[in-house]
A protein has these predicted regions:
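Small-residue (G/A/S/T)-rich helix-start motifs and N-terminal tracts that mark the onset
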Residues: 1-73
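Conserved residues at beta->alpha junctions
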Residues: 10, 78-79
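Conserved beta-alpha-beta core of the PfkB/ribokinase-like small-molecule kinase fold
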Residues: 76, 82-130
Length: 130
């Protein structure tokens, strides 16, 4: 791979079994330079496993910070809200030649369902770009 810079649009898994921790570890093991824009945080609370979306403004600032980086690939993981998904889609649309992998999380292993009804419709909009 000529360009070894890979971007993960991923959530933070507090148990490090998935999300951005796993993405960055995989990139490192394969000699790639990983970048990340955090889509959400997670926590195990009295309510169970919870997903806390990154504030829209903060997520946009993350993407804006990466605007001038040329990536060899982009991997999309957990997109917790329609607005975060829209921002991610706008970002990848600006990079038409960059390979994109869409690996969405729709149901967390810990049995907490991420709100998916509107989000599924938004994810369909990614298909022409991945």
């Amino acid at each position: 791979m000529k360009n070894n810079r890979i971007l993960a649009l991923s959530g933070n898994d507090i148990f490090s079994g998935g999300g951005l921790s796993a993405d960055l570890a995989t990139y490192t093991l394969n000699g790639l330079h990983g970048f990340v824009a955090v889509t959400c945080l997670t926590a195990l609370t009295e309510k169970g496993f919870e997903v806390f979306p990154t504030d829209d403004t903060i997520f946009q600032h993350e993407l804006d910070s990466l605007r001038d980086v040329e990536f060899g690939g982009i991997k999309i993981g957990l997109l917790p809200t329609v607005s975060v998904a829209e921002k991610a889609l706008d970002f990848i649309k600006q990079r038409p030649g960059v390979p994109v992998v869409l690996d969405p999380v729709l149901v967390c292993k810990e049995t907490h369902d991420v709100a998916v009804s509107e989000l599924c419709q938004e994810l369909i909009r990614f298909f022409p770009h991945v």
